[in-house]
Regions:
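Active-site beta->alpha N-cap acidic-glycine motif
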Residues: 1-68
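Short glycine/proline-rich turn/loop motifs
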Residues: 4, 88-92
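Conserved, mostly hydrophobic/aromatic
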Residues: 8, 72, 123
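Short, well-ordered beta-to-alpha junction loops that form the rim of enzyme active sites
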Residues: 38, 74, 125
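Acidic, His- and aromatic-enriched active-site or binding-groove loops in soluble protein domains
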Residues: 59-60, 91-98
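Histidine-centered catalytic micro-motifs
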Residues: 68-76
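Short, flexible, mixed-charge acidic loops at enzyme active sites
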Residues: 77-89
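Catalytic domains of cell-wall/extracellular-matrix polysaccharide-remodeling enzymes
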Residues: 96-125
Length: 125
């Protein structure tokens, strides 16, 4: 059996207790998930506790162990009331913005990840 697991909204100040519980389950099952890291989180709803000081190194280690890293948006701030191509919501960080603005946000986020040793070619919103 093949299993794919995707974890979104990964930030230095997420709920680390909940993340640890999920990580334990995944480790016990031998599953290496795709984790979507928000490069420059500005979403107050994702601020759950103090930032983990070794966040970037921690996820570089997980990447070395087989976890896949994705860029999950840029700041996680919804700036439009657009649903995009697959409208699950009527708001978005990217949908409805100009190509140039979206490209700038993607490149900026990618550079943040790269500067912390997490180079990836996977992008998800």
């Amino acid at each position: 059996m093949r299993i794919a697991v995707r974890l979104d909204d990964i930030t230095p100040d997420m709920d680390w207790e909940k993340f640890g519980e999920v990580k334990t389950l995944l480790d016990n099952a031998g599953v290496c998930p795709l984790v979507g890291i928000v490069p420059d989180n500005k979403d107050p709803n994702l601020h759950k506790q103090e930032s983990k000081k070794d966040f970037w190194r921690y996820f570089a280690t997980l990447k070395d162990k087989g976890w896949s890293i994705a860029q999950h948006g840029y700041t996680h701030i919804y700036t439009t009331k657009e649903g995009g191509l697959f409208p699950l919501n009527d708001f978005s960080e990217f949908a409805g913005l100009s190509y140039d603005k979206q490209l700038y946000m993607i490149k900026s986020g990618k550079e943040i990840l790269r500067s912390h040793g997490l180079d990836t070619d996977i992008f998800m919103t």
